[in-house]
A protein has these predicted regions:
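Amphipathic beta-strand/beta-sheet edge segments enriched in Tyr/Trp
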Residues: 24, 88-154
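Short beta-strand->alpha-helix linker/helix-N-cap micro-motif
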Residues: 28-93, 106, 110
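Hydrophobic beta-strand positions that form the internal "hydrophobic ladder"
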Residues: 169, 213, 253-257, 299-303, ...
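Short loop/turn segments that connect beta-strands within beta-propeller blades
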Residues: 127, 185-189, 229-233, 274-278, ...
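Residue-level detector of Asp-centered blade-edge/turn motifs that repeat once per structural unit
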Residues: 163-165, 208-209, 251-252, 297-298, ...
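A flexible loop/linker signature enriched in serine peptidases of the S9 family
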Residues: 163, 173-180, 196-199, 216-225, ...
Length: 430
């Protein structure tokens, strides 16, 4: 998919409008609680053309996959629907759906009009027989997946969570012969090339508004930071001296933390760039290498990697956003790197080396409990959280070549997202 087609497809979001809904309902669920049983019957096609039938099937498949991925909703098996009457959107028999243990019912209707498809999705609470929310979307064939993702995001909003299904993952790939920046849907679909250079571009990082990607490029001879607006296609050089890498936007989008060798001795230190004034401030002052900054969701702290305990033994530290109050948070083992702060604020995922295997671990900052996410004897690296804190994307050599995978916060539901070329350094929009 080309970038132009991707941006055109995004326009479907602007055509969405809400149907009349009752008072807002927010369903709450916490980790460890049972998931919400969700019924998603086949979409009712009002104009039964082959194109409309295919469009309805695609939307239903993507919606079901999104719900299954959520860790919030449990789609009911299709076989359950055979025990009750077929769905009639004009007269819903809620007792039927309650009999197969559905708590929520998501209905869909679709019609074709002049080569475009109009989809109406509605969500009901089965036990109370209440209509909760409805949405209408219009799209051509290329925008059907986006329609499904947007409807799935409405389900997440009911749960009071950040939507994740319309988010993007930026990454580096050599599938076209050179390391370039790409982006793809959360599930690996619709990979789209962002940069077009004949020299390495790497370490992409999303801005909070999801419009800009910061990255490092060697196009000017050294490793410099650039900002690329993915909608306008414009780029801005924001560093000119030293080696600059590992950029990370602050949650408010006003500052860019990064690692640079700007010091006279060429040592790697962490800086914060004020993006309005375009002035950098040095945050770390240590003879060791300080790198891989990651902001806390409040923007008041930064986690980072440093080998100040000894070369070859990196550890995870945390400091205030102005560089003060530095303290070590990792423990056990002698190699911890690449911290990524969860959007929930209570956890940091990082890479740890044990017996020459690089695996991902999650440290709970409140309890000091550690959960191992990966079990493969491979290079598992560059973790990045989903916006809701329920999933982690990372790159791994478990298949032989570097590819991008996702895994849930508890180490379950491992999924491979890429296959062409080598793919690495993923960064999920926040």
């Amino acid at each position: 998919m080309t970038l132009k087609r991707t941006l055109v497809a995004l326009a479907v979001l602007l055509s969405a409008f809400g149907l009349f809904s009752q008072q807002e309902v927010v369903l709450k669920i916490t980790e460890g609680m049972p998931m919400i049983n969700l019924a998603i019957p086949e979409i009712v096609v009002r104009t039964p053309t082959p194109a409309a039938q295919a469009a309805a099937a695609e939307i239903h498949q993507v919606l079901s996959a999104d719900a299954a991925y959520s860790r919030v909703f449990q789609p009911l098996p299709k076989a359950y629907y055979g025990y009750i009457r077929p769905l009639n959107p004009d007269r819903i028999h809620f007792k039927d759906w309650d009999s197969i243990q559905a708590r929520l019912l998501l209905t869909g209707e679709l019609r074709e009009d002049g080569g475009r498809f109009i989809f109406d999705g509605k969500v009901y609470d089965v036990r109370s027989e209440r209509y909760i929310v409805g949405k209408r979307y219009q799209a051509d064939k290329a925008g059907l997946r986006l329609v499904a993702h947007k409807m799935a995001d409405e389900l997440m909003k009911l749960h009071g969570e950040k939507p994740i299904f319309t988010t993007k993952i930026a990454f580096v790939s050599n599938r076209d012969g050179n390391d370039e920046i790409y982006m793809m849907d959360y599930d690996g679909a619709a990979p789209t090339r962002i940069t077009f250079n004949r020299i390495k571009d790497y370490m992409p990082a999303w801005s909070p508004d999801q419009r800009t990607i910061a990255f490092t490029s060697y196009r000017a001879g050294g490793a410099h930071l650039y900002l690329r607006n993915i909608y306008e296609g414009t780029e801005t050089l924001v560093s000119s001296k030293g080696t600059n890498y590992a950029a990370a936007f602050s949650p408010d989008g006003r500052r860019l933390a990064f690692c640079s060798t700007l010091t006279e001795d060429g040592n790697a230190e962490i800086y914060a760039l004020d993006l309005a004034a375009m002035r950098s401030r040095r945050l770390t002052y240590n003879s060791a290498t300080d790198t891989a900054p990651s902001w806390s969701p409040t923007g008041r702290e930064i986690a980072f990697t440093t080998d100040r305990l000894g070369a070859g033994s990196p550890q995870i530290y945390v400091m205030d956003a102005e560089g003060a109050n530095v303290r070590k948070v990792s423990f056990g083992g002698n190699y911890h790197d690449s911290p990524a702060w969860a959007p929930t604020g209570d956890r940091i995922v990082y890479v740890s080396r044990v017996e020459n295997a690089f695996d991902l671990y999650v440290l709970n900052l409140r309890t000091n409990q550690i959960v191992k996410l990966t079990e493969q004897r491979a290079f598992n690296e560059s973790p990045s959280w989903s916006p809701d804190g329920r999933h982690v994307v990372f790159s791994s050599s478990m298949s032989g070549s570097l590819q991008i995978y996702s895994v849930d916060y508890d180490g379950t539901n491992l999924r491979r997202l890429t296959d062409r070329g080598e793919n690495k350094l993923p960064n999920w929009t926040n």
